[in-house]
C-alpha cells in the first residue's frame, strides 16, 4: 500500500528540518491519509478509499464522490479511481439517454 492519496495523488515529500543554528537534517513529510468509505449516488454503491484529509474536504466541497471524479483530471487519479470514474460516466450517459 503506497503512501499516496487515491484521488489527488498527494504523496510523500522530502525536505529538511532547519534548526535555529541553520543545521539541516533530512526528513520525510507524510500526507495525512485516512481510510474512508464514500458512497457513489450514481452507482448506488459504497467504495473504500485511502485518501488525504485535504481530498476528503474537496470531495465534500464539490458535492460528493461522483461530482469530484467527473471534474477531476485523470492523471491525478489512481487506476482504481479512474475505473470508478469511467463507470460513473457510463451510468450517467445511460441515464441521460
Swiss-Prot record:
GO molecular function terms noted in the UniProt entry: structural constituent of ribosome
Similarity comment: Belongs to the bacterial ribosomal protein bL28 family.
GO cellular component, one term: cytosolic large ribosomal subunit
Species per Swiss-Prot/TrEMBL record: Brucella ovis (strain ATCC 25840 / 63/290 / NCTC 10512)
Name this polypeptide is given: Large ribosomal subunit protein bL28
Pfam families per UniProt: Ribosomal_L28 (PF00830)
GO biological process, one term: translation
Keywords: Ribonucleoprotein, Ribosomal protein
Amino acid at each position: 500500500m503506497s503512501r499516496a492519496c487515491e484521488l489527488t495523488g498527494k504523496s510523500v515529500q522530502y525536505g529538511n528540518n532547519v534548526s535555529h543554528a541553520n543545521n539541516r537534517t533530512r526528513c520525510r513529510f507524510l500526507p495525512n491519509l485516512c481510510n474512508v468509505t464514500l458512497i457513489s449516488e450514481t452507482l448506488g454503491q459504497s467504495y473504500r478509499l485511502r485518501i488525504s484529509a485535504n481530498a476528503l474536504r474537496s470531495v465534500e466541497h464539490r458535492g460528493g464522490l461522483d461530482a469530484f471524479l467527473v471534474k477531476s483530471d485523470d492523471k491525478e487519479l489512481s487506476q482504481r479511481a479512474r475505473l470508478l470514474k469511467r463507470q460513473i460516466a457510463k451510468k450517467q450517459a445511460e441515464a441521460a439517454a
